[in-house]
């Protein structure tokens, strides 16, 4: 089956969509991606053929599907609406798998919500009657190193681990770290695409209790070596749940609200930073 992922990444959007798509992509043998070449994107790190789009036009995507005869379109993109999905289906007949994080309407054959809070009944009336709904933690897309790390009982090197995703455009990592006691050893994980990286590096140099990890290869181990995690209410939550870690979730964008609400109801520590 020829599979096309439609997803983007950038310094503004972050890396979460592409990262989880790459986990799902391992389930298929013939995979390609269609992406906009945005600033700070992960295009060069995608180990599959990438079609660089020139616009957000749905017709450009439709033409690509027709020309390359893709059989399954996997949409992981907040900018593609239910009406766009209907148009794609009408024009191409391609099978559609749509990611969703906000309990929104979709016109797809398979609906995938990988967040722990999600349940199939949430989508009654929001998706076609014959749509296959895949929801909840059992469908979480977590990298293999987390499953391996969950078996390890690591010595705790750090009092706190902070990660606000790969780009952290609001520079919350620095803000959170500066509010913690200077007697605590704090690890901060980020990426080289973080627009606030120089500020973080300067902060780390001025504080000998800060350990800054940039593009670290094994985030799972770092998390497992920490007494408490302070993480964004994103896919990091599923990873923390798998590790059975002590964590606090920070909600700072709208698409994290459902996860944050669910965590709070379950008794987990949640903080909102808008």
Curated annotation (Swiss-Prot):
One of its GO terms (molecular function) is hydrolase activity. The active site is at 17 (proton acceptor). Its EC number is 3.6.1.57. Changing residue 17 to N: Strongly impaired catalytic activity. It is an enzyme of class 3 (hydrolase). NCBIfam families: PseG. Nucleotide sugar hydrolase that catalyzes the fourth step in the biosynthesis of pseudaminic acid, a sialic-acid-like sugar that is used to modify flagellin. This is UDP-2,4-diacetamido-2,4,6-trideoxy-beta-L-altropyranose hydrolase. It comes from Campylobacter jejuni subsp. jejuni serotype O:2 (strain ATCC 700819 / NCTC 11168).
